[in-house]
A protein has these predicted regions:
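Non-heme Fe(II)-dependent double-stranded beta-helix
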Residues: 1-21, 27-120
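Non-heme Fe(II)/2-oxoglutarate
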Residues: 199-299
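Double-stranded beta-helix
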Residues: 137-204, 208-221
Length: 299
């Protein structure tokens, strides 16, 4: 299978088709240099504030819309319009978002379609995640690794056999060709990756110094990082990323929110988060539905 880079400077007639086929798209140049600097400075400031009291760090976490200067990253017209296209519906935001600053690498293929009990090659999944990357990863380590087309196939894991037995699905799509190839997504600062929550991915991808375009499995990357780190091409700057989840009104979104409601880490974020009137009005003007059910649930 050839390597695939699904990139767009602006919305395209092929964007939705490619998202459905490959499980992700890259939206290029969404943010200007001054916005990137502002977001990076704000993330660094808030991370340092959290670190001042290590024992309370988890108790102070909030969602991105609760930080006025960072909220602009999610309340972006081009980004929201793209999400509308991909979901073919009004996007719903329910408070699941976060930022990262120089986070310790955690590698391993997984998907985030929690509480999803449907067959991936017989149904669509109307929930996606965005990653706003605030430094270049086209030639350096630290970016996103993706399995193209993994959004529409069974993925090996501990829950797979249980699903096949329970729902009487066949093994025909279990080990397709796409499991033999993965890619390190080539993002530049200000790009946004949008991927279906069923798409298998891994964070903090490694690029080698001498084979920059070679994408390895996360297990091999962990070995190289620990024992052969001299082969790794470093990021070159502090790694800053913003993540957020959006969905369309559906039973799948309801199921996912039930999962989120019982996630200990997310409970803390929901409890601490608060959207001011300016954020609510801006979201409404962009056609974004802000669902504060989980925020109110844990107040």
């Amino acid at each position: 299978m050839k390597k695939v880079e699904i990139s767009y400077n602006k919305s395209s007639v092929n964007l939705v088709d490619d998202y459905k086929k490959y499980g992700y798209v890259i939206l290029k140049n969404v943010f200007e240099d001054n916005e990137i600097r502002s977001f990076r400075n704000e993330i660094k400031k808030n991370e340092l504030d959290l670190e001042k009291n290590v024992h309370r760090i988890n108790n102070n976490l909030k969602d991105v819309l609760s930080y006025p200067k960072l909220s602009k990253a999610l309340l972006n017209k081009e980004l929201i319009n793209t999400i509308k296209q991909l979901l073919n519906s009004t996007p719903v935001y329910f408070g699941q978002s976060s930022f990262r600053w120089n986070e310790k690498p955690s590698r391993g293929f997984h998907n985030d379609a929690n509480n999803d009990n449907e067959c991936p090659f017989q149904s669509e999944y109307p929930i996606l995640r965005i990653g706003i990357y605030l430094q270049d990863h086209d030639q350096t380590s630290g970016g996103l690794k993706i399995w193209p087309k993994s959004n529409s196939v069974w993925q090996p894991g501990r829950a797979l056999l249980k699903k096949i037995i329970k729902y009487k699905y066949s093994f025909k799509n279990l080990f397709p060709q796409q499991y033999l190839k993965n890619i390190n997504v080539k993002t530049k600062a200000g790009d946004v990756v949008l991927w279906n929550l069923r798409t298998a991915h891994s964070g903090s991808a490694i690029r080698l110094k001498y084979f920059t375009n070679c994408s390895l499995s996360p297990q091999i990357e962990n070995f190289i990082s620990k024992y052969l780190n001299f082969l790794v091409k470093p990021i070159g700057t502090e790694r800053a990323v913003i993540f957020s989840t959006f969905g369309a009104e559906s039973h799948q979104l309801n199921n996912f929110m039930k999962y989120a409601e019982n996630h200990e880490g997310l409970k803390i974020i929901f409890k601490n988060s608060n959207w001011n009137d300016l954020v609510i009005n801006e979201g409404f003007s962009l056609g974004l539905k802000l669902n504060n059910k989980l925020l109110e649930r844990f107040k």
